[in-house]
Amino acid sequence: MANWFGGVKEFKASVLYFILKQRYKIILHSNPNEPSDLVFGNPLQQARKILSYQNTKRVFYTGENEAPNFNLFDYAIGFDELDFNDRYLRMPLYYAYLHYKAMLVNDTTSPYKLKALYTLKKPSHKFKENHPNLCAVVNGETDPLKRGFASFVASNPNAPIRNAFYDALNSIEPVAGGGSVRNTLGYKVKNKNEFLSQYKFNLCFENSQGYGYVTEKILDAYFSHTIPIYWGSPSVAKDFNPKSFVNVHDFKNFDEAIDYIRYLHTHQNAYLDMLYENPLNSVNEKAGFYQDLSFEKILDFFKNILENDTIYHNPSALYRDLNEPLVSVDDLRRDHERLLSKATPLLELSQNTSFKIYRKAYQKSLPLLRAIRRWIKK
């Protein structure tokens, strides 16, 4: 692994490791000088690490809103709807997070049922103890209509559209904030799913917009038996049943979306119809994931990688000194703020009346100045 968020421990907990170990013996290391069948990497702020692996098949994997560069990587797994033959697989982050949910509900007290593959591990007995409200609402022991209005959990404040929608919705009806952004509780919730299950809606906006960019946020809402209010991927209805959530992209503006949310909130039958819709779209009356995404499809993708000896990446493309630090998003933001601070006096000067008069006089004198320069050159 060139770089993986959380290192070896997190990779071993990932769905990719879980799937691959069903067929392959996996030996992990991060030494570019040792032989490897493939190397995982992510260019976000760490592109130089992958460049050390010159003669190894590179696999791009991301949980962020970024597209793969096929000059730098041989294969890629991402959010975008790309058709690049057998070199690309679309596997949004929500699908990866289904694995964590499955591991969580391998429990004798869980209201959710698991496929046999996940029941091989000895089950726990703590789910209901840790999720009493979630279990009660899923099992029909409490009325889903008699819950709070809406919940919101976010840790990244740099999401202006998400923040603006929260403020607009919160001005109509109080929205409980359990994260570090727009917190209303006085503390950050530790059990997100249990918290979400106590409300009728969950505001699950992505931090940025991108076609196909669907993360775990909408999955958390479904898992918590609450209706997602979603914004992020304009094509999200390909991934999830549009009758099962509020898609803010369907409305002209925030006001229209909020009016619809208020309608659901005040009309019991409409709310319950949406709540009990299958989250997945159906093809031939069978619910399934978009583009038939499955463990088998993912295994076939890696089977092709491992059996194909071709290395596609261009060693000369995007090459840079491995010791040269890359520019990060924070660096760019600081540079922008520094340049803006230097430009501010000039901007203020440009609004000054005297400055405008001198500038206008200078512009009128330009033809004469050019003529003088030509005469001097002669």
Model-derived regions, located:
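Histidine-centered beta-alpha loop that forms part of the nucleotide-sugar donor binding/catalytic region
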Residues: 61-65, 179-180, 206, 226
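His/Asp/Glu-enriched short active-site or ligand-binding loop at hydrolase and phosphoryl-transfer sites
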Residues: 174-182, 204, 232
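Pol beta-like nucleotidyltransferase catalytic core
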Residues: 1-24, 30-35, 39-41, 45-54, ...
